[in-house]
């Protein structure tokens, strides 16, 4: 009988995390969704109430789940500045992985999802195409801290890691304003109500610029592949 894989999904209430959780459930996984309330999780998943910023709380919440085989991390904690984002976002990843590592000897893969800021788009124009081998841009950037921590922590661990790097992401999530599709939909609705044509609201430069968008379902498929693919170990992969 084939072993049923068990995932702990951090950030499952967001667009990316939801896309991953839906894909895993469809593939027959047992999926635990970590959130502060432990509720509001997707059909077919189980809620785990935990504050990811609290290391002791993470350890207590994960302790009953000794069979976790994979961690999927797409959680994000906003902060007033790039520098201020580093500590909480690194802490959430570290707290989750260390808690699972302690509770579950079955852990074998950590799949981190970062994003296009890995290539410095927040600072202006970036190279096209972006490649995983591109040099890092000006720090601070919590994506770099997260990947560096995984690389170092995995050296003496049984588990391996993967960093998935998508561009702009579209998809569905409840109560999440970080959604390009939602913004376009609201703009279109306002234009319709006012009887205005749906014109591009930005500059000529923005209109003519090359952009890529990944659907959350595509990221979910990539995460499911990265979970067990022999080629997906200890490196980053663009998802476009």
Annotated model-derived regions:
Residues 157-221:
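NAD(P)-dependent short-chain dehydrogenase/reductase
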Residues 28-40:
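Conserved glycine-rich Rossmann-like NAD(P)H-binding loop of the short-chain dehydrogenase/reductase
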Residues 136-167, 172:
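Active-site Tyr-X1-5-Lys
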């Amino acid at each position: 009988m084939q072993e049923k894989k068990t995932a702990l999904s951090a950030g499952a209430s967001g667009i990316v995390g939801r896309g991953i959780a839906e894909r895993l459930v469809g593939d027959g996984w047992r999926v635990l969704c970590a959130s502060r309330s432990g509720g509001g999780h997707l059909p077919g998943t189980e809620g785990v109430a935990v504050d990811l910023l609290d290391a002791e709380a993470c350890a207590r919440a994960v302790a009953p789940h000794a069979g976790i085989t994979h961690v999927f991390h797409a959680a994000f904690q906003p902060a007033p500045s790039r520098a201020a984002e580093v500590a909480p976002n690194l802490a959430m990843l570290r707290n989750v992985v260390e808690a699972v590592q302690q509770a579950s000897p079955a852990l074998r893969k950590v799949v981190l999802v970062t994003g296009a800021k890995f290539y410095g788009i927040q600072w202006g124009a970036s190279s096209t195409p972006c490649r995983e081998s591109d040099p890092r841009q000006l720090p601070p950037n919590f994506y770099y801290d997260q990947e560096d921590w995984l690389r170092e922590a995995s050296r003496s661990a049984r588990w391996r890691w993967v960093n998935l790097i998508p561009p702009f992401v579209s998809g569905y999530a409840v109560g999440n304003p970080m959604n390009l599709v939602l913004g376009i939909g609201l703009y279109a609705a306002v234009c319709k109500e006012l009887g205005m044509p749906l014109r591009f609201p930005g500059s000529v430069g923005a209109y003519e610029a090359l952009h890529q968008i990944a659907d959350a379902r595509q990221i979910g498929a990539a995460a499911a592949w990265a979970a067990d693919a022999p080629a997906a170990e200890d490196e980053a992969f663009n998802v476009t």
